[in-house]
Amino acid sequence: MSLYPNVLSVSNKYGFINQSEQFEDRNVASDDVRNYKIVHRGDFAYNPARINVGSIAMLKRFNSGIVSPMYICFRINASIVDPSYFELFLQSRAFKDEMEIRLEGSVRRCLSFDAMCEIHIPCPNIIEQCTIAEQIGKISSKIELEESLLTAYANQKDWLLKQMFI
């Protein structure tokens, strides 16, 4: 039995998730997890063959876990680059363009860690990075709230239409 009960995967939609959530109908983790990599809250990991579809994330949901040896795991120096700012950079067009240039291979294109480290990150001072991340976080929260209100209004409309034509 592993000391790390969370066997994790990185989803392009949800970030770090338990493998059991991603692969509900089967257990994909090896019985021998000795070669698995340990990740802690704040660490980043990506699948080098799936980063082009967004399979890179920072661990936030769990305190720790393990990931398949195929993942590249790293931690950034938070005194130089704010983790939330870096996370936003990973979602940017600038990152995607830089990544695309560095992908290697023809069928399953991969991004090595060395190639990842070559990507230039525009870095204002740490205080400004934190301010940017905080402001974008507020905007994201507002968008989530508005989307949930829109869903509620759509459900209410559907209910009213059903009641009108019973």
Predicted features along the sequence, with ranges:
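DNA target-recognition domains and sequence-specific DNA-contacting regions of bacterial/archaeal
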Residues: 1-123
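Amphipathic alpha-helical coiled-coil/heptad-repeat segments
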Residues: 122-166
